[in-house]
Amino acid sequence: VPKEINDKRREENERAAELHSSFLMKMARRLYKMHQEKLLTHHNDETDWNRWKYAESLRRNFFFVNMINILGAKARLLNEQYFEPLGDDIVLQLPLPATEHMWRCCDEEEWAIAREHAMRRPANSPPVARTLRELLEQDKAGTLDASTLLPVTRLIFACAKVAPKGDSLGDL
């Protein structure tokens, strides 16, 4: 296939991706507004398994939408000049993902045990960041040990660190 045709096809795909990305951001923001109270309730504070499952699923999806958006811009699949952040009020305030043990529970009883276990911390252990904002503050203060983070949280953190300028994550 000639280079001209490949270049034209790539440009068309980039334009389509930019349009779809904008739609995805808009729908994510709308969904956040509809469920904001549930979404902002931390794992330690939620006692209803069904509400927790729903909110945790949504939270993880918001983080993935944000990561895809950032990585799409950084990989030049989306034009970085048109980068549209998901929104700090969403990404920085959401509780970070729960432990894998909690996430993989199959019933309420198993979840309650996993939740109880996750809430136990040694008395002299450093505070665990509950949000991306707290995680970034710990990093800035030099008190973050990224090796202690859950794999999904490490991905969220890494994407926040490489966010394009103009997204205040990229300006932190």
Predicted segment positions?
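C-terminal effector modules of eukaryotic transcription factors
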Residues: 12-172
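C-terminal transcriptional activation/regulatory domains of eukaryotic transcription factors
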Residues: 1-12
